[in-house]
Amino acid sequence: MKKHGILNSDLAKIVDDLGHTDRVCIGDLGLPIPSGVRKIDLSLKAGFPSFQDLLDVYLEHVLVEKIILAEEIKEQNPEQLSQILRKLDDGVTVEYVSHEQLKALNQDVKAVIRTGENTPYSNIILQSGVTI
């Protein structure tokens, strides 16, 4: 049995297979997932696991060069935005698009990880960096 790292086998496989510029989305309960895109549904109940719980684990294991957020998070969920920005390494590019554009961008992600988060616009696309 695995002792360390990401224990969820589906999530671990996605993380292990990431290459430079590959994208993964961490989403809230309400984020629609496009047909044909891999869904890793970790939601157990409203609020659990939280968006921040998943973001912490993801950032511990993946070098991120860019994130994409919905513009609406600035006004509709500023506390969530503040927590996200505090966790980013220096040099990570932050891009804001409309919520509709973010949903459209999910057509090309490697996976959408659904959390139990039940606060508005708690969705992020994370683009992998390169360690060399």
Curated annotation (Swiss-Prot):
HAMAP family: D_rib_pyranase (MF_01661). NCBIfam families: PRK11797.1. The gene is rbsD. Disulfide bonds: none annotated. Coiled coil: none annotated. Belongs to the RbsD / FucU family. RbsD subfamily. It comes from Streptococcus uberis (strain ATCC BAA-854 / 0140J). Its EC number is 5.4.99.62. Pathway: Carbohydrate metabolism; D-ribose degradation; D-ribose 5-phosphate from beta-D-ribopyranose: step 1/2. This is D-ribose pyranase. It is found in: Cytoplasm. It is an enzyme of class 5 (isomerase). The active site is at H20 (proton donor). Keywords: Carbohydrate metabolism, Cytoplasm, Isomerase. Homodecamer. One of its GO terms (molecular function) is intramolecular lyase activity.
